[in-house]
A protein has these predicted regions:
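Catalytic histidine neighborhood in serine/cysteine hydrolases
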Residues: 191-210
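Flexible "cap/lid" loop of the alpha/beta hydrolase fold
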Residues: 74-75, 79-118
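Conserved alpha/beta-hydrolase "acid-adjacent" motif
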Residues: 183-189
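Gly/Ala-rich beta-loop-alpha elbow adjacent to hydrolase catalytic centers
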Residues: 61-65, 69
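Conserved alpha/beta-hydrolase catalytic His-Asp/Glu region
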Residues: 93-96, 111-168
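Conserved HGGG/HGGXW glycine-rich cap/lid loop of the alpha/beta-hydrolase fold
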Residues: 1-48, 62
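Catalytic histidine-centered segment of alpha/beta-hydrolase-like enzymes
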Residues: 208-221
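Short beta-strand/loop motif that positions the catalytic acidic residue
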Residues: 170, 176-178, 182
Length: 234
Protein backbone atom coordinates (compact mmCIF):
# COMPACT_ATOMS: atom_id res chain seq x y z
CA UNK A 1 0.00 0.00 0.00
CA UNK A 2 1.26 3.45 -0.89
CA UNK A 3 0.92 5.31 2.40
CA UNK A 4 0.35 8.86 1.17
CA UNK A 5 1.12 11.66 3.63
CA UNK A 6 -1.89 13.72 4.65
CA UNK A 7 -1.95 17.23 6.08
CA UNK A 8 -5.06 17.94 8.15
CA UNK A 9 -6.03 21.58 8.64
CA UNK A 10 -8.18 22.42 11.68
CA UNK A 11 -11.00 24.96 11.63
CA UNK A 12 -11.60 28.03 13.76
CA UNK A 13 -10.97 27.35 17.48
CA UNK A 14 -10.05 23.74 16.68
CA UNK A 15 -7.06 21.61 17.64
CA UNK A 16 -6.03 18.19 16.33
CA UNK A 17 -8.90 16.76 18.42
CA UNK A 18 -11.14 17.80 15.50
CA UNK A 19 -9.54 14.88 13.61
CA UNK A 20 -9.02 12.49 16.53
CA UNK A 21 -11.07 9.67 15.04
CA UNK A 22 -9.69 10.13 11.53
CA UNK A 23 -6.10 10.06 12.82
CA UNK A 24 -6.86 6.74 14.51
CA UNK A 25 -8.64 5.35 11.45
CA UNK A 26 -5.81 6.29 9.08
CA UNK A 27 -3.00 4.86 11.21
CA UNK A 28 -0.13 3.97 8.88
CA UNK A 29 -0.39 7.17 6.88
CA UNK A 30 2.08 9.89 7.87
CA UNK A 31 -0.21 12.63 9.26
CA UNK A 32 0.59 16.26 10.00
CA UNK A 33 -1.70 18.79 11.64
CA UNK A 34 -1.27 22.26 10.18
CA UNK A 35 -0.57 25.20 12.50
CA UNK A 36 -3.53 27.56 12.18
CA UNK A 37 -2.90 29.63 15.31
CA UNK A 38 0.29 31.57 14.53
CA UNK A 39 -0.77 33.63 11.51
CA UNK A 40 -3.39 36.29 10.84
CA UNK A 41 -3.91 35.55 7.14
CA UNK A 42 -5.03 32.51 5.18
CA UNK A 43 -2.08 32.97 2.79
CA UNK A 44 0.43 32.95 5.67
CA UNK A 45 -1.22 29.82 7.10
CA UNK A 46 -0.94 28.14 3.68
CA UNK A 47 2.70 29.20 3.29
CA UNK A 48 3.53 27.84 6.76
CA UNK A 49 1.83 24.55 5.87
CA UNK A 50 3.80 24.28 2.61
CA UNK A 51 7.11 24.99 4.39
CA UNK A 52 6.41 22.17 6.84
CA UNK A 53 4.77 19.61 4.52
CA UNK A 54 6.42 16.80 2.54
CA UNK A 55 7.01 17.35 -1.20
CA UNK A 56 3.72 15.67 -2.14
CA UNK A 57 0.75 15.19 0.12
CA UNK A 58 -3.01 14.85 0.39
CA UNK A 59 -4.93 17.60 2.10
CA UNK A 60 -8.06 17.88 4.17
CA UNK A 61 -9.50 21.00 5.74
CA UNK A 62 -12.69 21.73 7.63
CA UNK A 63 -14.29 25.20 7.61
CA UNK A 64 -11.40 27.67 8.00
CA UNK A 65 -9.18 24.69 7.23
CA UNK A 66 -10.93 24.50 3.88
CA UNK A 67 -10.10 28.16 3.18
CA UNK A 68 -6.45 27.33 3.85
CA UNK A 69 -6.67 24.19 1.68
CA UNK A 70 -8.01 26.23 -1.25
CA UNK A 71 -5.14 28.68 -0.80
CA UNK A 72 -2.62 25.80 -0.78
CA UNK A 73 -4.19 24.61 -4.04
CA UNK A 74 -3.69 28.12 -5.45
CA UNK A 75 -0.08 28.49 -4.27
CA UNK A 76 1.28 24.99 -4.96
CA UNK A 77 -1.19 22.80 -6.88
CA UNK A 78 1.64 20.57 -8.12
CA UNK A 79 2.35 19.36 -4.57
CA UNK A 80 -1.21 18.30 -3.72
CA UNK A 81 -2.21 14.71 -4.60
CA UNK A 82 -5.86 14.98 -3.50
CA UNK A 83 -7.97 17.26 -1.33
CA UNK A 84 -11.03 16.89 0.90
CA UNK A 85 -12.86 20.19 1.43
CA UNK A 86 -15.20 19.79 4.39
CA UNK A 87 -17.91 22.12 5.74
CA UNK A 88 -16.31 25.02 3.91
CA UNK A 89 -16.88 27.69 1.27
CA UNK A 90 -15.10 29.21 -1.72
CA UNK A 91 -16.70 32.60 -1.16
CA UNK A 92 -15.38 35.60 0.75
CA UNK A 93 -17.04 36.92 3.90
CA UNK A 94 -20.19 39.01 3.54
CA UNK A 95 -20.33 42.32 5.48
CA UNK A 96 -22.83 40.68 7.85
CA UNK A 97 -20.49 37.76 8.55
CA UNK A 98 -17.59 40.12 9.17
CA UNK A 99 -19.67 42.19 11.61
CA UNK A 100 -20.60 39.00 13.48
CA UNK A 101 -16.92 38.01 13.73
CA UNK A 102 -16.03 41.39 15.26
CA UNK A 103 -18.87 40.89 17.74
CA UNK A 104 -17.51 37.44 18.69
CA UNK A 105 -14.03 38.91 19.20
CA UNK A 106 -15.55 41.53 21.53
CA UNK A 107 -17.41 38.80 23.44
CA UNK A 108 -14.19 36.78 23.75
CA UNK A 109 -12.35 39.78 25.19
CA UNK A 110 -15.22 40.65 27.57
CA UNK A 111 -16.36 37.21 28.71
CA UNK A 112 -13.56 34.82 27.75
CA UNK A 113 -13.07 32.27 25.02
CA UNK A 114 -15.12 29.60 26.79
CA UNK A 115 -18.19 31.84 26.63
CA UNK A 116 -17.74 32.18 22.86
CA UNK A 117 -17.33 28.43 22.46
CA UNK A 118 -20.49 27.69 24.44
CA UNK A 119 -22.35 30.28 22.36
CA UNK A 120 -21.15 28.70 19.11
CA UNK A 121 -21.83 25.13 20.26
CA UNK A 122 -25.56 25.63 19.79
CA UNK A 123 -25.03 26.13 16.05
CA UNK A 124 -22.02 23.91 15.40
CA UNK A 125 -23.65 20.49 15.66
CA UNK A 126 -26.91 18.98 14.47
CA UNK A 127 -29.61 18.14 17.04
CA UNK A 128 -29.20 14.46 16.13
CA UNK A 129 -25.50 14.42 17.03
CA UNK A 130 -25.45 16.91 19.92
CA UNK A 131 -24.23 15.55 23.24
CA UNK A 132 -22.68 16.92 26.41
CA UNK A 133 -19.46 15.03 25.62
CA UNK A 134 -19.19 16.55 22.14
CA UNK A 135 -19.89 20.05 23.47
CA UNK A 136 -17.16 19.64 26.09
CA UNK A 137 -14.65 18.56 23.42
CA UNK A 138 -15.50 21.68 21.40
CA UNK A 139 -15.09 23.93 24.46
CA UNK A 140 -11.77 22.25 25.37
CA UNK A 141 -10.41 22.87 21.87
CA UNK A 142 -11.42 26.54 22.02
CA UNK A 143 -9.79 26.99 25.43
CA UNK A 144 -6.57 25.47 24.06
CA UNK A 145 -6.52 27.95 21.15
CA UNK A 146 -7.11 30.94 23.44
CA UNK A 147 -8.20 34.50 22.75
CA UNK A 148 -5.16 35.73 20.80
CA UNK A 149 -5.18 32.68 18.53
CA UNK A 150 -8.91 33.20 18.01
CA UNK A 151 -8.40 36.86 17.05
CA UNK A 152 -5.68 35.94 14.52
CA UNK A 153 -7.92 33.26 13.02
CA UNK A 154 -10.91 35.57 12.74
CA UNK A 155 -8.74 38.22 11.06
CA UNK A 156 -7.55 35.62 8.56
CA UNK A 157 -11.13 34.55 7.85
CA UNK A 158 -12.34 38.15 7.47
CA UNK A 159 -9.56 38.95 4.97
CA UNK A 160 -9.67 35.67 3.06
CA UNK A 161 -9.79 35.86 -0.73
CA UNK A 162 -12.79 34.79 -2.75
CA UNK A 163 -11.73 31.62 -4.59
CA UNK A 164 -14.81 31.30 -6.84
CA UNK A 165 -12.94 32.07 -10.07
CA UNK A 166 -10.20 29.55 -9.26
CA UNK A 167 -12.37 26.48 -8.69
CA UNK A 168 -12.54 25.54 -12.37
CA UNK A 169 -8.71 25.49 -12.58
CA UNK A 170 -8.25 22.84 -9.86
CA UNK A 171 -6.84 19.67 -11.41
CA UNK A 172 -6.37 17.32 -8.43
CA UNK A 173 -9.00 14.83 -7.21
CA UNK A 174 -11.28 16.76 -4.84
CA UNK A 175 -13.96 15.47 -2.49
CA UNK A 176 -16.38 18.09 -1.16
CA UNK A 177 -18.11 17.11 2.08
CA UNK A 178 -20.93 18.90 3.90
CA UNK A 179 -23.49 18.25 6.61
CA UNK A 180 -27.02 18.77 5.37
CA UNK A 181 -27.88 20.44 8.71
CA UNK A 182 -24.84 22.78 8.75
CA UNK A 183 -26.05 26.04 10.33
CA UNK A 184 -22.69 27.83 9.91
CA UNK A 185 -21.93 27.39 6.19
CA UNK A 186 -24.90 26.61 3.91
CA UNK A 187 -24.61 23.14 2.31
CA UNK A 188 -25.38 24.94 -0.95
CA UNK A 189 -21.73 26.12 -0.97
CA UNK A 190 -20.61 22.49 -1.16
CA UNK A 191 -22.91 21.85 -4.10
CA UNK A 192 -21.53 24.94 -5.87
CA UNK A 193 -17.93 23.84 -5.30
CA UNK A 194 -18.55 20.28 -6.43
CA UNK A 195 -20.35 21.50 -9.55
CA UNK A 196 -17.48 23.84 -10.49
CA UNK A 197 -14.33 21.88 -9.61
CA UNK A 198 -13.62 19.48 -12.51
CA UNK A 199 -14.32 15.86 -11.53
CA UNK A 200 -15.12 16.72 -7.91
CA UNK A 201 -17.01 14.19 -5.82
CA UNK A 202 -19.79 15.43 -3.50
CA UNK A 203 -20.60 13.78 -0.17
CA UNK A 204 -23.63 15.17 1.69
CA UNK A 205 -24.11 13.82 5.22
CA UNK A 206 -27.73 13.75 6.46
CA UNK A 207 -28.60 14.96 9.98
CA UNK A 208 -25.08 16.35 10.35
CA UNK A 209 -23.93 19.85 11.27
CA UNK A 210 -20.70 21.82 10.86
CA UNK A 211 -18.37 19.66 12.99
CA UNK A 212 -18.80 16.64 10.76
CA UNK A 213 -15.51 14.90 11.59
CA UNK A 214 -16.65 14.75 15.23
CA UNK A 215 -20.34 14.19 14.51
CA UNK A 216 -19.89 11.40 11.92
CA UNK A 217 -16.41 10.04 12.60
CA UNK A 218 -16.75 6.69 10.83
CA UNK A 219 -18.34 8.12 7.70
CA UNK A 220 -15.79 10.94 7.48
CA UNK A 221 -12.88 8.54 7.97
CA UNK A 222 -14.22 6.38 5.14
CA UNK A 223 -14.46 9.44 2.86
CA UNK A 224 -10.85 10.40 3.69
CA UNK A 225 -9.70 6.83 3.08
CA UNK A 226 -11.22 7.02 -0.40
CA UNK A 227 -9.55 10.40 -0.99
CA UNK A 228 -6.18 8.91 -0.01
CA UNK A 229 -6.76 5.98 -2.38
CA UNK A 230 -7.31 8.50 -5.20
CA UNK A 231 -4.11 10.28 -4.15
CA UNK A 232 -2.15 7.02 -4.25
CA UNK A 233 -3.62 6.12 -7.65
CA UNK A 234 -2.98 9.57 -9.11
Amino acid sequence: VNFVSIVMIPGLLCTDDLYRDQIAALAGHPIRIADTTSDASVTAMAERLLADAPDKFALCGLSMGGYVALEVLRLAPERVLAAALMATSHRADTPGQTAMRHQLIATARDEGIEAVARLLCERLVAPETASAALRERIVRMATAIGIEGFVRQQQAIIDRPDQSDRLSTIKVPVTVVAGEADAIIPPERAREMAATIPGARLEMLPATGHMLTMERPDRTSEILRRSLAMAAAG
